[in-house]
Swiss-Prot record:
This is Uracil-DNA glycosylase. The active site is at residue 64. Belongs to the uracil-DNA glycosylase (UDG) superfamily. UNG family. It catalyses: Hydrolyzes single-stranded DNA or mismatched double-stranded DNA and polynucleotides, releasing free uracil. PROSITE patterns: U_DNA_GLYCOSYLASE. GO terms for biological process: base-excision repair, AP site formation via deaminated base removal. It comes from Salmonella typhimurium (strain LT2 / SGSC1412 / ATCC 700720). InterPro entries: UDG_fam1, Ura-DNA_Glyclase_AS, Uracil-DNA_glycosylase-like, Uracil-DNA_glycosylase-like_sf. Monomer.
């Protein structure tokens, strides 16, 4: 049963913590000094904007945002309309083609339609310097996103967690497998997808789990906002 609690309810105290204020201050300082930081400030918390706590059915964990121009917009693995899908997302599409009947790979990589169905697309680090992967990994974001995972664990039941790669799988320690459904596989990156991401069947297994527990399944075909109106 969906909780009435919102992200605002459960995160208000966390956002007053000194570490969190310091994280925001550091990121703001870099932007003000002329360093390009992705995603743009208005998009940093989009994962929470598009998927409210009470609507979370699935969590897909990423690591840090894409660090190329115009890509990152606050949803893990997703890119803005007009930007070519990056290699990891292309491999996710390949797995969807292989496991979801009727899935046709789109030309875009914008996953907002997943988020609006209850798929929380959460990077564990929410900002990055342009061209420098993991450049904000030690700023405190992971303390915050670990708290987010623990709050989902606490306030929701029957959430499917898709943990791809060793970084995401370490977060499994925060999740109670008696309350939630955890699926693990290698990361969809070209470096590791052939080691077991392809063939993991996670998208189909997620829908199977949701259906068995009386939840609406996810339409995994990403739809651009204009197409869904």
């Amino acid at each position: 049963m969906a909780t009435e609690l919102t992200w605002h309810d459960v995160l208000a105290d966390e956002k007053q913590q000194p570490y969190f204020i310091n994280t925001l201050h550091t990121v703001a300082g870099e932007r003000q000094s002329g360093i390009t930081v992705y995603p743009p400030q208005k998009d940093v918390f989009n994962a929470f904007r598009f998927t409210e706590l009470g609507d979370v059915k699935v969590v897909i964990l990423g690591q840090d945002p894409y660090h190329g121009p115009g890509q990152a917009h606050g949803l893990a693995f997703s890119v803005r309309p007009g930007i070519a899908p990056p290699p990891s997302l292309v491999n996710m599409y390949k797995e969807l083609e292989a496991s979801i009947p009727g899935f046709v790979r789109p030309a875009h990589g914008y996953l907002e339609s997943w988020a609006r169905q209850g798929v929380l697309l959460l990077n564990t680090v929410l900002t990055v310097r342009a061209g420098q992967a993991h450049s904000h990994a030690s700023l405190g974001w992971e303390t915050f996103t670990d708290k987010v995972i623990s709050l989902i664990n606490q306030h929701r039941e029957g959430v499917v967690f898709l943990l791809w790669g060793s970084h995401a799988q370490k977060k499994g320690a925060i999740i109670d497998p008696q309350r939630h459904h955890i699926l693990k596989a290698p990361h969809p990156s070209p470096l590791s997808a052939h080691r077991g991401f392809f063939g993991c069947n996670h998208f189909a297994l997620t829908n199977q789990w949701l259906e068995q527990h009386g939840e609406k399944t996810i339409d995994w075909t990403p739809v651009l906002p204009a197409e869904s109106e």
